[in-house]
Amino acid sequence: IVAIKRGEETIIPGGLDKLELQDLAYFMTKKEYIPYIREIVGKEDYEDVHNVMIMGGDKAAVRTAHTMPEYMNLKIIERDEERCHKLNELIDKKNVMIIHGDGRDMSLLREENISNTQAFVALTGNAETNILACLAAKRRGVRKTIAQVENLDYISMAESLDIGTIINKKIIAAGHIYQMLLDNEMM
């Protein structure tokens, strides 16, 4: 567990922290351990995601494309045409499609079959854009939405809109650092 969301508070867990009812726990694990995590949290029958759409072609999108299982189809929508060409060079996988366009354009999203997408991830450098894009995706029936929100002041507001998962690099990094410290103490 790299973070716990308890009401308005985000906790980077230590060795003594415990989950409470209504907590939202953020896990980080290797692919092979996902079934165990699902079993622990009672989501064994959770339907797998097959179609993913990412708005924004940053490093996180590239990393996601490289680590995604072959059974998943990924569409990355990027506004910058040069970046699209670079993404095509960086990602050479049959199950990944790079689309030049604006991920906020609802006609483009419909054209790219957003209604058949199980997960939508907004990774632009703009928190407001990411939040609104996830809201729009939710309204189009996307089951799982993830918005990158770097402005800490926006996190609780975004969570109150029920847009799905909020990711923040600072919180994730803090969780990694703390986990490394714990690992070093156990050696």
Regions found by a protein language model. Give the residues of each.
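Cytosolic regulatory regions of ion transport systems
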Residues: 1-187
